[in-house]
Curated annotation (Swiss-Prot):
<dbReference type="GO" id="GO:0019104">
    <property type="term" value="F:DNA N-glycosylase activity"/>
</dbReference>
<keyword id="KW-0255">Endonuclease</keyword>
<dbReference type="InterPro" id="IPR003265">
    <property type="entry name" value="HhH-GPD_domain"/>
</dbReference>
<keyword id="KW-0411">Iron-sulfur</keyword>
<dbReference type="GO" id="GO:0006285">
    <property type="term" value="P:base-excision repair, AP site formation"/>
</dbReference>
<dbReference type="Pfam" id="PF00730">
    <property type="entry name" value="HhH-GPD"/>
</dbReference>
<feature type="binding site">
    <location>
        <position position="198"/>
    </location>
    <ligand>
        <name>[4Fe-4S] cluster</name>
    </ligand>
</feature>
<dbReference type="GO" id="GO:0004519">
    <property type="term" value="F:endonuclease activity"/>
</dbReference>
<dbReference type="GO" id="GO:0046872">
    <property type="term" value="F:metal ion binding"/>
</dbReference>
<feature type="domain" description="HhH">
    <location>
        <begin position="118"/>
        <end position="137"/>
    </location>
</feature>
<comment type="similarity">
    <text>Belongs to the Nth/MutY family.</text>
</comment>
<dbReference type="GO" id="GO:0140078">
    <property type="term" value="F:class I DNA-(apurinic or apyrimidinic site) endonuclease activity"/>
</dbReference>
<dbReference type="InterPro" id="IPR011257">
    <property type="entry name" value="DNA_glycosylase"/>
</dbReference>
<keyword id="KW-0456">Lyase</keyword>
<keyword id="KW-0479">Metal-binding</keyword>
<keyword id="KW-0238">DNA-binding</keyword>
<keyword id="KW-0540">Nuclease</keyword>
Length: 223
């Protein structure tokens, strides 16, 4: 069993995932609305999922329903005020308005070309690799593996891909080893581990279930 599968097994035993802690999965599962999921994921950029969910709910209350048409016709200052709690309101409001101009409702039930849709999404201002990959994996079960700050920190400390692996290197490593369903589960598990145990400051190494695979722990704590 390679290290990726060992990590997956250990983390599945340790954490129980609550979808409400992961805004993109929660919104896609609740609404079955790809456009709403894209907006929710944009709101989560450089923010916590908790704050992003508050902002999303406020935006939904403000415009009535999150659809491209409602967002297109909403005043940008109204959007800024509604999403303020998620931070970077001016930029995110502009991105949200821009997405509404470009995207009509995407149907979850149609077959899509994942790479073509990824190229389409990442060409839109405000949608980078991570945001696109989150939407593709969460809503369409495309075989993508989004990397956020928690996952990057955990993988960097583990060290099996080097001390500063690039987004593409981490993503490709896991994509070659897991199905889309397992990729989504592992994505959530690694984020949960980064939030609760492998924290940016003062990681709780003595409570870590994967410390025996961790270069940071073996080099700095155990010895």
């Amino acid at each position: 069993m390679d290290i990726a599968n060992q990590l997956y097994m250990k983390l599945r035993e340790e954490y129980k995932i609550d979808q409400k802690e992961f805004i993109s999965s929660y919104i896609c599962g609740k609404t079955r609305n790809v456009f709403a999921t894209i907006l929710a994921t944009i709101l989560s950029q450089n923010s916590t999922d908790k704050s992003a969910l508050i902002a999303f709910s406020k935006l939904n209350e403000t415009v009535g329903e999150i659809t491209p048409d409602r967002i297109k016709h909403a005043d940008i200052n109204t959007i800024i005020d509604a999403i303020r709690v998620a931070g970077l309101g001016n930029s995110k409001a502009r991105y949200i308005k821009n997405v509404a101009e470009v995207i009509n409702d995407l149907d979850l039930n149609i077959e899509i070309d994942c790479q073509k849709l990824r190229d389409f999404l990442t060409a839109i201002e405000g949608i980078g690799d991570k945001t696109a990959d989150v939407v593709l994996l969460t809503c369409f079960r495309c075989r993508e593996f989004p990397i956020d700050t928690h996952i990057r920190r955990v993988i960097s400390r583990l060290g099996f891909l080097g001390s500063s692996p690039k987004y593409k290197d981490i993503s490709e490593y896991f994509k070659t080893r897991f199905s889309s369903e397992d990729l989504l589960n592992l994505h959530h598990l690694l984020i949960a581990h980064g939030r609760k145990t492998c924290k940016s400051r003062k990681p709780i190494c003595d409570k870590c279930v994967i410390r025996d695979y961790c270069k940071y722990y073996l080099d700095n704590i155990k010895n």
